[in-house]
Amino acid sequence: MKTWDDFLAAMAARHAFFAKAGCVVSDYGITEVFAAPYTEAELKAIFKKARAGKSVTAAEALKFKSAWLFEGLRADAKSNWTTQLHYNCLRDNNTAMFDKLGPDTGFDCIGDWSVTENLARLFDRLEREDALPR
């Protein structure tokens, strides 16, 4: 995958794979609600920069994560899936169980970061584009 458009196509292919397998619910385990404004031109430039092995700024990374989340939720809405946002997730915080079972095996916890503003921004944009999932 070389371009932003390739990335979007890969996301769509994975979504279709899970839909074909009978999936009707998605769960996004995210550290925070990503909802920074961005343009498609910015995303193409950010993706190109990262693919060239150059470091992206924190602001660029946030724009990319915001677009990734938005596109995933848009696909969920299009497929009439139910979406769970597992936000403020602190992953793999039990070292003994991580060593025994590996990553993402259920030993996570929820943090106490503020999310209201970003959640409202994300849901409003999804609603305006008729892409708010269940």
Task: Enumerate the predicted regions with their spans.
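Histidine/acidic residue-rich metal-binding segments in metalloenzymes
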Residues: 1-133
